[in-house]
Design a protein with these regions (language model features):
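DNA-contacting surface of Y-family translesion DNA polymerases
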Residues: 61, 229, 237-379, 390-392
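Short Gly/Ser/Thr- and Asp/Glu-enriched loop/turn motifs at secondary-structure junctions
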Residues: 149-153, 192-195, 328-332, 377-381
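Gly/Gly-Pro- and Ser/Thr-rich, intrinsically disordered tail segments characteristic of DNA damage-repair
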Residues: 21-24, 42-263, 267-273, 283, ...
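Intrinsically disordered, glycine-rich low-complexity segments
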Residues: 12-14, 30-39, 49
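Residues at or immediately flanking beta-strands
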Residues: 186-188, 334, 381-383
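Low-complexity, intrinsically disordered or signal/transmembrane-proximal segments
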Residues: 8-9, 17, 24, 34
């Protein structure tokens, strides 16, 4: 394994850098996007990956560390080094200082404040976050022939670039340094033979690191992972598999393709390949999914309607953001709630016209929640599913 970890730096105000970012076309008012400053710190040189060890195809995954919270710390230097959470009702992102207190995305703010009384809560500024991400994407496009953009992450296809980049780790170190000097943000990089491995490898080197595994090491990593680390495995799938005594990828491999398909439908067939290290999703593809799901199991059963509504809003925003990132819209929405007595309620309504807008999707999700009122048992799980997905008009 090759690993580079960069020391954490304190953000610094830099007038020239702030002006450069705010002057960028993507940040002009007519684009409804703004951007602020960054920090200038050199990034140490990453160890090299010998060309002979470089897998082909080669996929790079870049993930901005604690994105929303990091931007807020850059915008307000007084927040540097402080536990910061971004969100309203539920944490959408939190700084690494907050994570040291056990905080995480999806946690109700009331619970977060009990765990970390000095927590600073900031409402989100999505247009500013998009502007920071745009700068990172532009750097990636100048460096890679094929880039797939998401809000806080990017996939770069480096297949066939060995002549241009004979030492991938050295070039990735330069790329990360450029992103850092331009935006003030740190990114974690994972390098693998497909997008699944690239993301998984990077996950184990957060924050501000570079991870790479040789092909034979990828297999060893995959087998010992919990199933929830695989793409497409959400809380409901984890629960279904746990009822069968399946918690690790190694156990999941014991199921046949037909068994998984019968258990999980089309997602089961994809899972059969993923648990064997296969991921054929192309970088930059415009595949239209049948549905988009977001859900969470509460650490503590919830009986407060306001806490439940805050979580539903958070999940609806995440699902809607996923639609917009992919140029899609949804024509239907379902809400599923699991109670502490194991009873499940599920209801669905049509979204007319189809939409990808936060207010419309949140309003529909909350209407579904109100239609389920009547039971007095606490809530253990809540999930949202968007369906009838199509390309945005």
């Amino acid at each position: 394994m090759v690993l580079s970890r960069v020391p954490q730096h304190k953000p610094r105000v830099d007038g020239e850098q702030m002006f450069a970012i705010l002057s960028h076309p993507a940040c002009r008012p007519e684009r409804k996007e703004q951007e602020k400053k960054g920090r200038l710190v050199s990034t140490p040189f990453s160890p090299s990956i010998p060309p002979s060890m470089t897998p082909r195809p080669l996929i790079l995954h870049l993930d901005i560390d604690a994105f929303f919270a990091s931007v807020e710390q850059l915008r307000n230097p007084r927040l540097a080094g402080q536990p910061v959470a971004v969100g309203s009702g539920v944490i959408a992102s939190c700084s690494y200082e907050a994570r040291e207190h056990g905080l995480k995305a999806g946690m109700p703010l009331g619970q977060a404040l009990r765990k970390c009384p000095p927590l600073v809560i900031v409402r989100g500024h999505e247009s500013i976050y998009r502007c920071y991400a745009t700068r990172m994407f532009e750097i990636c496009h100048n460096w890679s022939p094929l880039v797939e953009e998401h809000l806080d992450e990017a996939y770069c296809d480096l297949t066939g670039t060995e002549r241009i980049y004979p030492d991938p780790a050295k070039e990735i170190a330069r790329l990360r340094a450029q992103i850092h000097s331009t935006t003030g943000l740190t990114v974690t990089a994972g390098l693998g033979r497909n997008r699944m491995f690239a993301r998984l490898i990077g996950k184990f080197h957060k924050p501000d690191g570079l991870g790479y595994l040789e092909p034979e090491q990828e297999e060893a990593l995959l087998l010992r992972l919990p199933v929830e680390n695989l793409p497409g495995v959400g809380p409901r799938t984890v629960e279904i598999l746990a009822n069968l005594g399946i918690e690790k990828v190694e156990q999941l491999r014991e199921l046949s393709r037909s068994a998984l398909a019968g258990l999980l439908g089309r997602n089961g067939e994809a899972l059969y390949e993923r648990c064997r290290g296969e991921d054929h999703r192309p970088i930059g593809g415009r595949e239209i999914p049948r549905s988009i799901q977001r859900g969470t199991s509460f650490d503590e059963d919830v009986s407060c309607p306001r806490t439940l509504d805050a979580m539903i809003e958070y999940l609806a925003e995440r699902a809607a953001r996923n639609l917009r990132q992919r140029g899609l819209e949804a024509g239907g929405i379902s809400l599923q709630i699991a109670h502490s007595d194991h009873r499940r309620d599920r209801r669905r309504i049509v979204l007319s016209p189809p939409t990808a807008l936060d207010p419309s999707i949140i309003r529909a999700a909350l209407a579904l929640r109100r239609s389920m009122e009547g039971r007095r048992t606490a809530i253990r799980f809540v999930g949202i599913q968007l369906d009838r997905i199509r390309l945005a008009a």
